[in-house]
Amino acid sequence: MAEGPYGRPVTASLTWQPTLSAADVDDIVSLLATAERADGTGPVSEDVRLTLRPDQRVGAARHLLAVSATGVEASGPRRPIVGYAHLGGALDSRQAEIVVDPGHRGLGIGRALATALTEALGDPPARLDVWAHGDLPPAAALAARLGFARTRVLFQLRRPLGAVAPLPEPQLPAGVTVRAFVPGRDDEAWLAVNAAAFADHPEQGRWTLDDLALRRAEPWFDPRGFFVAERDGQLVGFHWTKIHEVDETPPPGTRPGPIGEVYVVGVLPGAGGAGLGRALTLIGLRHLQAEGLAAVLLYVDEDNERAVRMYTGLDFTVHTRDVSYHWRGAAAD
């Protein structure tokens, strides 16, 4: 059994799995909900949640389960999962996320999970970046102790919709028209524009048909809220919106309800024309407002100054921050 802080024993055993059973999925989903209630923010990304399916393999992804070692033995009822880590991304550039049950924190489980991630990188070791959602102090402290460097910040921005925050009229560039995405017909063209628009983005620009299909199969998918822009028959931009049935991180003192999302906005470099990204954003916002939503959120990298400037110009403000930590290869003293 591994040791936690000050030599205290870690009360969990760690197991790597390429797939999950239905029972594993139920336990992990329950763990995520418990952590979210305690922390006020979702502990893992949508990408990770989409892999939580029984017997589903997704590329080189692997699951690391921390199972309680203080409960009954394997011959009895299922022992609870008290920690979980997801290792995804390409084999040479890994992305990971970690969550520990609030009732089992401070026992070294997070450290054990993070250490196991670094030991699973191969030889020579692959790059490893670990996301921490909510920019919580305990995650920052653990990252520093284990030799991780803070390298990327993802803002969640929000703005209200409706009469309290009127939206400007969208102004499309000359020759550009907008219509709804047609599943099956627009897939390849959309993937090409997405890859070009996010060529420097470590996650979004790598999407494949499988990634698109996973999201099209989700209950929230609605092509009526997926807008594509064309010029002379060529797809040159898009705005994909999303509606969450329940706001996972409502402002303090408010009751959680539905909320819209600017899921992703992209413009083909050099082909869209000035102002297309702003116009597409406004078209999507007006759609979400027409659906009766009172607020909208989006995610954007802190260092994407152009996009941040556009969104703040549309009255978005920072709601939460997620942080990516890069492993430097050696733990701090």
Swiss-Prot record:
Residue numbers binding 1D-myo-inositol 2-(L-cysteinylamino)-2-deoxy-alpha-D-glucopyranoside: E46, E203, K242, E261, Y299
Residue ranges constituting the N-acetyltransferase domain according to the UniProt record: 18-170, 176-333
Keyword Transferase annotated: yes
Reaction equations catalysed: 1D-myo-inositol 2-(L-cysteinylamino)-2-deoxy-alpha-D-glucopyranoside + acetyl-CoA = mycothiol + CoA + H(+)
Any Gene Ontology biological process: mycothiol biosynthetic process
Listed Gene3D superfamilies: 3.40.630.30
Entry keywords, A to Z: Acyltransferase, Repeat, Transferase
InterPro entries: Acyl_CoA_acyltransferase, Bact_Acetyltransf, GNAT_dom, Mycothiol_AcTrfase
Binding site for acetyl-CoA 1: I98, V99, V100
SUPFAM superfamilies tied to this protein: Acyl-CoA N-acyltransferases (Nat) (SSF55729)
Keyword Disulfide bond assigned: no
Residues bound to acetyl-CoA 2: 265-267, 272-278, 304-309
The EC number(s) this enzyme carries: 2.3.1.189
Alphabetical list of Pfam families matching this protein: Acetyltransf_1, Acetyltransf_7
GO MF annotations, alphabetized: mycothiol synthase activity
PROSITE patterns: GNAT
Task performed by this protein: Catalyzes the transfer of acetyl from acetyl-CoA to desacetylmycothiol (Cys-GlcN-Ins) to form mycothiol.
Family: Belongs to the acetyltransferase family. MshD subfamily.
Subunit organization: Monomer.
PANTHER family: AMINOALKYLPHOSPHONATE N-ACETYLTRANSFERASE-RELATED-RELATED (PTHR43877)
Protein name as catalogued: Mycothiol acetyltransferase
Gene name as annotated: mshD
